[in-house]
C-alpha cells in the first residue's frame, strides 16, 4: 500500500512539474537565436574609433570569452597594426594563426593562449601587463600607444578575420559601450552559438497580441534593448536589477517587475512576478484582461547586454537578418491616444463617421496605455483643415478614478462660420513622472496627439410667428379706421330706417362704438337699455288733453 501511495505522489509531482513548465506552451530551442517571431543578439561592450599612431599603426584589442579549445586567427589582409589578445578565463585555448609581418601580436599575462603557426616561421609574441578586465587593458594600451582603434568582444569564436577595410568613425577616443561586433567592417567574427540560450513558442490567434519574455533568476543579463515591431502587449520579466529599454514608439501595453525606459521616460515596476511560467501566465492574462498569449520566450544567455526583436509570426515573412529600426518621422516619441465623447460622463464615444454640431460640447480623453502612472499635461490645442488652422480653447474636466487619463472638453463654435467638413483636432502634450532615484519630476518633450472629427455648423430652426414691418402696421391701422367708419355709417342708417328718434343722439352711438371698440362685438359687454318711444307733437297735445280729463274724473267722482 505504501509503495502504491509513493508511486501516486511521484506521478503527481511529475505531472505538476510538467504542467508548470508547459502551462503556456511547449518551449523549443531557437536555433541561431532567431526565428519568425523573435531575434536575440548579444550586445557586448566594445568601441571603434579612427585612431592611428603617427606611423599609421592601428591598435586593436580582442577580448576572448568562453574560450574554445581551438579557433582561427587570420591576419593576412590586416593593415599595419597592433593586436592585443586578453581573456579573464582560465581555460587554455589554441589559435591557428595566419600571420602578417605588418602586425604585432600581444597577449596579456595570465591569458592562456597558444598560437599554432602553419608555416613554422619564428613568431614573436609580446607580453602585455596582467589585467583584471577589458577596461584596464584599454587604459594600458591608450597610455602605451597613444590611443586605441577598437575593442572587440569575441565569445566562443570559430574564426577571427581582419579584412583590411578602413574604419570611418569620427571619434578618436575609445569608450566602451554595448555594440554589435558584426557592424565593424574591418573585422569579421564567426562565433559558436550558445546552446539553449533562447527557447520560445508561438500560438496563433485573432485579436490583440500578447508576448511574454522571461529571464529566469540566476541569469546574468542586466540590460535588455527591446524592439517591438508591431502594436502589442508585452510582459518583460527578469531578475532583480534587470533594466529594460524599449526603442520604438508603438501603441503598446507593458507589464514588468523591473525598471523600464521607454523613449528615455522611466517606468516603475508594476508588480512582483516570479520566474514560474504559471505565475507569469496568470498575472499577464489578468492584467491585460486577455484570453490568449501569442508567444512565450525564455532567455538563458549569461551576458550583460542583449538586444531583442519581437514581431507577429508570419510564414511568408521570416526575418533572416535583423535590420536597424528607426522611428518614422510621423510616429510620436511615445504612445498616446485621444478618444472623443459626446457626454460629460465620458461613456458615449464618438466614432470617426459621426458628425458633431458646432454648438455642442465635445469631451476628449487623452491617455497612454504604456504610461499609466504618468501625468499628462496639455499646453495647447488647435483644429486644422487645409489651409485653415485655428487655435482651440479647451477646459480641463475633473476625474476621480485611479490612473485617470487627461480629460478635456471643447466647443467647435469657432467653426460656425465655415462649411461642414473634416477637421484634425490636435493637442500638444507631454508626460511627466517622478524619478525613482532623486524624486525629481521628469517630463518628456512635447508631442502632438490628434483625432479626426467631422464638424457640421449649427443651423437654428426657422420662427413660425409672423413679423410685421412698418408698412404692415400702417395698413392694418388704416383698415381698422375704415371699418370703423363703415360700421358707424351702417348703424346710423339702421337707426334712421327703424324710426329711432334723434334723442338717441350721438351719446347712444358713441356708447355703442365704445363698447364695440372695447369688446370687439356690437353687443358689447353691457346690457342694452330699452329705447323709449316719443309721439309726434299732434299726438302729444291730444294725449295731454286726455290725460288731463282722465285725471279730473276721479276727483269729481270722489267729490
UniProtKB/Swiss-Prot annotation:
Residue span of region Disordered: 528-559
Gene inactivation effect: Viable, with survival to adult stages. Brain tissue shows widespread vascular malformations with localized widening of blood vessels. During embryogenesis, blood vessel connectivity between the dorsal aorta (DA), intersegmental vessels (ISVs) and posterior cardinal vein (PCV) appears normal at 72 hours post-fertilization (hpf). However, blood flow through ISVs is significantly reduced. Blood vessel pruning is increased, probably due to aberrant hemodynamics. Arterial ISVs have a slightly increased diameter, while venous ISVs have greatly reduced diameter.
Gene3D superfamilies: Zona pellucida, ZP-C domain (2.60.40.4100)
An MF annotation (GO) of this entry: type II transforming growth factor beta receptor binding
Biased composition (Low complexity): 536-546
Disulfides per UniProt: 25-201, 47-174, 381-427
GO biological process, one term: epithelial to mesenchymal transition
First and last residue of the signal peptide: 1-20
Major subcellular location class: membrane
Membrane topology: Single-pass type I membrane protein
Assembly mode: Homodimer; disulfide-linked.
Protein name, UniProt field: Endoglin
Organism, as annotated: Danio rerio
Amino acid at each position: 500500500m505504501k509503495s502504491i501511495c509513493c508511486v501516486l505522489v511521484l506521478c503527481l509531482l511529475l505531472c505538476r512539474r510538467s504542467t508548470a513548465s508547459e502551462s503556456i506552451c511547449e518551449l523549443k530551442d531557437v536555433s541561431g537565436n532567431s526565428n519568425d517571431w523573435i531575434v536575440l543578439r548579444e550586445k557586448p561592450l566594445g568601441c571603434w574609433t579612427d585612431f592611428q599612431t603617427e606611423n599609421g599603426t592601428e591598435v586593436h584589442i580582442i577580448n576572448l570569452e568562453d574560450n574554445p579549445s581551438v579557433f582561427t586567427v587570420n591576419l593576412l589582409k590586416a593593415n599595419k597594426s597592433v593586436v592585443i589578445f586578453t581573456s579573464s578565463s582560465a581555460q587554455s585555448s589554441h589559435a591557428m594563426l595566419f600571420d602578417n609581418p605588418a602586425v604585432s601580436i600581444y597577449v596579456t599575462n595570465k591569458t592562456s593562449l597558444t598560437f599554432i603557426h602553419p608555416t613554422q616561421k619564428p613568431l614573436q609574441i609580446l607580453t602585455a601587463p596582467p589585467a583584471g578586465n577589458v577596461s584596464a587593458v584599454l587604459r594600458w594600451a591608450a597610455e602605451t600607444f597613444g590611443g586605441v582603434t577598437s575593442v572587440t568582444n569575441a565569445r566562443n569564436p570559430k574564426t577571427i578575420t581582419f579584412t583590411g577595410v578602413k574604419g570611418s568613425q569620427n571619434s578618436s577616443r575609445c569608450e566602451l559601450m554595448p555594440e554589435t561586433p558584426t557592424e565593424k567592417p574591418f573585422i569579421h567574427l564567426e562565433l559558436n552559438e550558445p546552446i539553449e540560450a533562447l527557447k520560445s513558442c508561438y500560438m496563433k490567434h485573432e485579436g490583440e497580441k500578447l508576448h511574454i519574455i522571461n529571464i529566469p533568476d540566476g541569469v546574468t543579463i542586466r540590460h535588455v534593448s527591446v524592439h517591438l515591431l508591431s502594436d502589442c502587449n508585452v510582459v518583460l520579466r527578469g531578475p532583480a536589477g534587470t533594466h529594460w529599454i524599449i526603442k520604438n514608439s508603438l501603441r503598446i501595453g507593458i507589464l514588468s517587475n523591473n525598471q523600464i525606459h521607454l523613449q528615455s521616460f522611466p517606468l516603475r515596476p508594476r508588480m512582483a512576478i516570479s520566474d514560474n511560467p504559471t505565475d507569469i501566465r496568470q498575472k499577464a492574462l489578468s492584467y491585460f484582461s486577455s484570453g490568449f498569449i501569442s508567444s512565450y520566450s525564455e532567455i538563458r544567455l549569461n551576458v550583460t547586454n542583449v538586444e531583442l526583436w519581437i514581431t507577429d509570426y508570419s510564414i511568408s515573412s521570416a526575418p533572416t537578418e535583423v535590420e536597424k529600426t528607426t522611428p518614422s518621422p510621423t510616429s510620436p516619441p511615445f504612445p498616446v491616444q485621444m478618444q472623443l465623447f459626446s457626454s460629460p460622463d465620458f461613456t458615449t464615444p464618438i466614432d470617426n463617421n459621426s458628425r458633431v454640431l458646432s454648438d455642442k460640447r465635445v469631451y476628449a480623453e487623452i491617455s497612454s496605455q504604456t504610461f499609466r502612472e504618468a501625468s499628462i499635461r496639455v499646453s495647447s490645442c488647435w483644429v486644422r483643415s487645409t489651409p485653415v488652422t485655428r487655435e482651440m480653447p479647451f477646459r480641463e474636466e475633473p476625474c476621480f478614478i485611479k490612473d485617470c487619463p487627461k480629460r478635456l472638453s471643447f466647443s467647435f463654435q469657432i467653426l460656425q462660420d465655415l462649411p461642414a467638413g473634416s477637421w484634425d483636432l490636435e493637442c500638444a502634450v507631454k508626460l511627466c513622472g517622478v524619478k525613482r532615484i532623486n524624486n525629481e519630476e521628469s517630463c518628456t518633450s512635447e508631442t502632438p496627439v490628434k483625432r479626426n472629427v467631422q464638424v457640421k455648423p449649427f443651423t437654428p430652426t426657422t420662427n413660425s410667428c409672423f413679423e410685421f414691418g412698418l408698412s404692415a402696421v400702417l395698413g392694418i391701422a388704416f383698415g381698422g379706421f375704415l371699418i370703423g367708419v363703415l360700421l358707424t355709417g351702417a348703424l346710423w342708417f339702421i337707426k334712421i330706417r327703424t324710426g329711432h328718434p334723434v334723442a338717441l343722439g350721438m351719446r347712444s352711438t358713441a356708447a355703442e362704438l365704445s363698447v364695440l371698440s372695447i369688446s370687439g362685438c356690437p353687443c358689447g359687454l353691457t346690457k342694452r337699455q330699452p329705447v323709449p318711444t316719443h309721439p309726434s307733437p299732434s299726438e302729444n297735445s291730444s294725449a295731454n288733453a286726455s290725460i288731463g280729463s282722465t285725471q279730473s274724473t276721479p276727483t269729481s267722482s270722489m267729490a
